[in-house]
């Protein structure tokens, strides 16, 4: 729910302390008639734990499981056993580096990874379209944020070329094929995820010392590599817009992935800012670059406000992918920088996405929040955004530029429910792909960093859901 355009008020009690600057740092919309901005929005979020109210339960998995082929059900059964309890999960994590790649490919990879090559990823995209998921966020899974492994086997130049090639050979045909057969603004953009730690040698030192003159050459190389890829996206957006001028959202988007806090603070935020200035000018109808903010960080609300102010002052738009966070188990000073409990993170996430969504609804193409990806497996957060978009009629720009995203193979019950029961069309899946050894590392990181999410999605509840879905599949 949003307040009416004629009279918007701030309800202080509904805004966490870190968001109070919203009241102080008001800004004026580019359109004089729009008196409503992120500074004076009434923020209304779903019932929160802190208020003692119920939290929306995720949909059961049975209906989705009934749509899967037998092979995928078998693979999911294996995942259910592997995540049955903490002992099983921790044992799998310890053994994972020693499990042969062919075994991982058979049991796990096809569920969570798009494939090893363009052909396999294209087929993955077609399967997703059949499920009502119009597009993907592709991620070539090669990274080295700790600077501990050599990239000599996959030189950075090759990663850049392969990434650009995936734009032209996967994302472009994936969306072109739909532009001629579906309503043009019902198709989500295609995204290419750029991991800064994969796009420069010695990434940890370069990102940590991003503003250090001694690292200028390496810094410039990282900026150039990201710019090469994003420029391809920008030029394709401009070209396609001439052919499809009624399109309200970008056709494709370059997305800067998050790194750990020290690298994010010292380098990645500045890298995002540079790319926003180059490829998201207010003079362009479409944005071409999105950055990532991890909202489990205590300072995330203030940081987004700071970035918003810089965007207003310098004539460009932000692109936001908002996640809860992926490094909770490996951050060195997590007790100081991350909310102390899940409730704090959930409240922060829902309030910030509410503010951004409301701003996009009210200000439309004049919003400095040019594009939003709600990257979450949390059903309450996804339904919050879905209901906000349903609450007003005149919000075609917001509907096109607010996209819901989940990881491939995860939260499929949520994805299925949003599409089937709520008519959501603005949905994508994050699709990692690439060399088997690298995707193996990705899968291990998912187990380590998302262990709690994996257990809640899988384990014994998944095994029971699979068992219940089998009789219905055979008509019993």
Curated annotation (Swiss-Prot):
Record's keyword terms, sorted: FAD, Flavoprotein, Mitochondrion, Oxidoreductase, Proline metabolism, Transit peptide
Originating species: Saccharomyces cerevisiae (strain ATCC 204508 / S288c)
Gene Ontology CC: one annotated term: mitochondrial matrix
Protein name per its UniProtKB record: Proline dehydrogenase, mitochondrial
GO molecular function: FAD binding; proline dehydrogenase activity
Purpose of the protein: Converts proline to delta-1-pyrroline-5-carboxylate.
Cofactor(s) needed by this chain: FAD
Compartments where found: Mitochondrion matrix
Primary site of residence: mitochondrion
Family as reported in the entry's similarity comment: Belongs to the proline oxidase family.
GO biological process: proline catabolic process to glutamate
Pathway field: Amino-acid degradation; L-proline degradation into L-glutamate; L-glutamate from L-proline: step 1/2
EC number: 1.5.5.2
Note: The expression of proline oxidase is controlled by proline and oxygen.
Catalytic activity from the UniProt record: L-proline + a quinone = (S)-1-pyrroline-5-carboxylate + a quinol + H(+)
InterPro entries with a match to the protein in the record: FAD-linked_oxidoreductase-like, Proline_DH_dom, Proline_oxidase
Coiled-coil ranges per UniProt: none
Domain of life: Eukaryota
């Amino acid at each position: 729910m949003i307040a009416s355009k004629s009279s918007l008020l701030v309800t202080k009690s509904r805004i966490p302390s870190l968001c109070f600057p919203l009241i102080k740092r008001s800004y004026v919309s580019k359109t004089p008639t729009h008196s409503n901005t992120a500074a004076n929005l009434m923020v209304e979020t779903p019932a929160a734990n802190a208020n003692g109210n119920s939290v929306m339960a995720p949909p059961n998995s049975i209906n989705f499981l009934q749509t899967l082929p037998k092979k995928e059900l078998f693979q999911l059964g294996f995942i259910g056993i592997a995540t049955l309890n903490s002992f099983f999960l921790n044992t799998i994590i310890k053994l994972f580096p020693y499990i042969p790649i062919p075994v991982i490919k058979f049991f796990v990879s096809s569920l969570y990874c798009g494939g090893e090559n363009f052909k396999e990823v294209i087929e993955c995209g077609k399967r997703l379209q059949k499920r009502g998921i119009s597009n993907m966020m592709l991620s070539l899974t090669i990274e080295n944020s700790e600077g501990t492994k050599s990239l000599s086997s996959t030189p950075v130049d090759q990663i850049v070329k392969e990434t650009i090639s995936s734009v032209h050979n996967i994302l472009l045909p994936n969306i072109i094929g739909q532009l001629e057969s579906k309503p043009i603004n019902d198709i989500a953009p295609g995204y290419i995820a750029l991991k800064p730690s994969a796009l420069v040698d010695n990434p940890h030192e370069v990102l940590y010392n991003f503003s250090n003159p001694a690292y200028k050459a390496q810094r410039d190389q990282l900026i150039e590599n990201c710019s090469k890829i994003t420029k391809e996206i920008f030029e394709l957006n401009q070209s396609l817009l001439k052919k499809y001028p009624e399109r309200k959202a970008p056709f494709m988007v370059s997305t800067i992935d998050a790194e750990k806090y020290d690298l994010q603070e010292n380098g990645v935020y500045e890298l995002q800012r540079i790319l926003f200035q180059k490829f998201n000018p207010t003079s362009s109808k479409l944005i071409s670059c999105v950055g990532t903010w991890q909202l489990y960080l205590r300072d995330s609300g203030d940081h987004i406000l700071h970035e918003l102010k810089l965007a207003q002052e310098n004539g460009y738009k932000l692109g936001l992918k908002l996640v809860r966070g992926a490094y909770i188990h490996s951050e060195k000073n997590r007790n100081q920088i991350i909310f102390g409990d899940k409730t704090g993170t959930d409240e922060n996430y829902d309030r910030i996405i509410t503010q951004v969504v409301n701003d996009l609804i009210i200000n439309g193409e004049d919003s400095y929040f040019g594009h939003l990806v709600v990257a979450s497996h949390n059903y309450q957060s996804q339904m919050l955004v879905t209901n906000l978009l349903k609450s007003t009629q005149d919000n075609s720009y917001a509907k096109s530029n607010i996209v819901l995203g989940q990881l491939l193979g995860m939260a499929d019950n949520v994805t299925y429910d949003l599409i089937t029961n709520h008519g959501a069309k603005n949905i994508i899946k994050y699709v990692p792909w690439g060399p088997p050894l690298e995707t193996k590392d990705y899968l291990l990181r998912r187990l380590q960093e998302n262990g709690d999410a994996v257990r809640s999605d899988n384990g014994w509840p998944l095994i029971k859901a699979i068992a219940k879905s089998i009789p219905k599949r055979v008509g019993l």
